[in-house]
Amino acid sequence: MKQEYKLKMLESEIRKVLSEALMEMKDPNIDPMKSLITISRVEVSKDKRYADVYVSVLGDEAKRKDVVNYFEQKKGYFRTYVAKNIRMYTAPELRFKEDKGIEATVRIGQLLDSIKESQKGDDNK
């Protein structure tokens, strides 16, 4: 139980540090999109060697893939930033992935809204 708690705290701290790194990053390719990018969650392996970083991006499919690929290219920068800001024996290897959970949540909300609208239309008849 204690080990799981420590792992969750580490995941939370890495997520916070990566968000800071993103905001401090000075790159003209990513600057216009910073407000559309969110580090939604981090999952660290039990041995703390790997961290799966889930990134959510508002925009179309191509933009989401471009951002995840960009993060993969810059993972050395992010890993160095994590190593400097979190006291660990070794910084975990970061693996960036697209978080589709937020997109699914928005889609479900849209479907529920359309159902409400159709029910209102049926009630008026």
Swiss-Prot record:
GO terms for biological process: maturation of SSU-rRNA. GO terms for molecular function: ribosomal small subunit binding. Keywords: Cytoplasm, Ribosome biogenesis. GO terms for cellular component: cytosol. InterPro entries: KH_dom-like_a/b, RbfA, RbfA_dom_sf, Ribosome-bd_factorA_CS. Pfam families: RBFA (PF02033). Coiled coil: none annotated. It is found in: Cytoplasm. Its main location: cytoplasm. One of several proteins that assist in the late maturation steps of the functional core of the 30S ribosomal subunit. Associates with free 30S ribosomal subunits (but not with 30S subunits that are part of 70S ribosomes or polysomes). Required for efficient processing of 16S rRNA. May interact with the 5'-terminal helix region of 16S rRNA. Monomer. Binds 30S ribosomal subunits, but not 50S ribosomal subunits or 70S ribosomes. Belongs to the RbfA family. NCBIfam families: rbfA. This is Ribosome-binding factor A. It comes from Fervidobacterium nodosum (strain ATCC 35602 / DSM 5306 / Rt17-B1).
